[in-house]
Amino acid sequence: MRYVDDKAVDLKIAYIGGGSKEWARKLMSDLALEESLEGTVYLYDIDVESARLNEAIGNKLNSQWKYKCVLSIEEALKDADFVVISILPGTFNEMMSDVHAPEKYGIYQSVGDTTGPGGLFRALRTIPIYVDFANKIKEYCPNAWVINYTNPMALCVRTLYETFPDIKAFGCCHEVFSTQSLITKALKEMEGIECKRDDIYTNVLGINHFTWITKAHYKEIDLFPVYMKFVEKHKDDGYEDRGDWQDSYFNSANLVKFDLFDKYGFIAAAGDRHLAEFTPKDYLKDPETVGKWKFHLTPVSWRIKNRESLIEKSRRIAKGEEEFKAVTSGEEGVKQIKALLGLGDLITNVNIPNRGQIGNVDFNTVVETNSLFTKDGVYPIFAGNIPDRVKLLMGPHILNQKMIFEAAVKKDKDLALQAMLNDPIVNLTYEDGKKLFDEMMDNTREYLKDWH
């Protein structure tokens, strides 16, 4: 990498999971639109065909970036300036178990990738993979900045740091962005003032997918009273800011978010599908309850069908049968890369180990707060303490992250079972909990062969 005038050129980005059908395209688009960056993206994926398709798609953009599919992770990582990771840990067969096996025991999960039984088993598969990633990064590109998009986010980032303490890594999630956008819509509706998400200040703190906003303002306007009026207006029927909540598995009417504000006095800053999984079974008692709160259980069968559609789309684009235009994705990975290269500072929310940015959470717990991005540095901004009422909800999950990591490293079934039973949505007897745990262990046995 070198600088020419106000540009960073000859950059090398290693993309682990470079066959991605969605995240890779977003990165391609944002890189193509950023004129101050130039280089090569090395695409590595165990699904070689998908990586080759992305190579063809990326190179069709005719941008200042080249894309190269490589067959070894070592070649991708060697001397990389940045590493991007977005993988599916396991297959949809394992995900089917993660999400749907617990339903036989009355446990419903709207996502199943971060918490609950699904989040646990996804983590048990993911952590060993990330141990290997961290060791290879240490060997081949120890000074690279690592951007993680994979879930469970907090445990992925924790594993990277526990394995390679000097790693320069952070996790990115767009859930907070949607809540910030919702606040701007509240400001427009209640006060007639239009602004963009980036124009408002929000103090963000928590853990990934269970983040909270404790302060928010636009210029001199305190946005909490505005949001309170907005919630009061819409808390019965909801507010569908992304279209009819029934039109997409990813839409909601924000009723969970509004209910949490009513109960706890702070703004829950994630989508309802994620927020519901972190609380006791108020919102996930059964499918009928989910419908009442106007969000969705996302079936894995839909994900399988959607993946097939995305693969076909990739093939059409690669053959030139369908056009692929670069459009701004709304993600911040490229903005973060620019800032780390010294091309303009940035403040945004990211997931990194706690170094004191949250006062009442143990050090090294991976937390999500605002951080300052500047040349070769990510500096967490002090966010204060998690409010006591909110911490009562968050506490079991913070403890579970520590237990799950330890269970995965030690390959300890008893500790993993204990973590599952500790989850607030797992309201089972020990006997039934162990039956579910053993069934899910069998379903993901290929990844947990030498556990005891």
Protein language model features and the residues they cover:
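A short, basic/flexible loop-to-alpha-helix module at the beginning of a structural domain
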Residues: 1-8, 38
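N-terminal Rossmann-like dinucleotide-binding module
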Residues: 10-41
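NAD(P)-binding Rossmann-fold cofactor-contacting core
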Residues: 37-59
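Short acidic low-complexity segments
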Residues: 66-79
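Redox-cofactor binding/interface segments in oxidoreductases and associated redox assembly factors
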Residues: 78, 84-85, 148
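Rossmann-fold NAD(P)-binding glycine/threonine-rich loop
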Residues: 93-163
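Internal, well-ordered domain-core segments that constitute the primary functional module
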Residues: 133-217
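Long, compositionally biased stretches enriched for glycine and/or charged residues
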Residues: 191-452
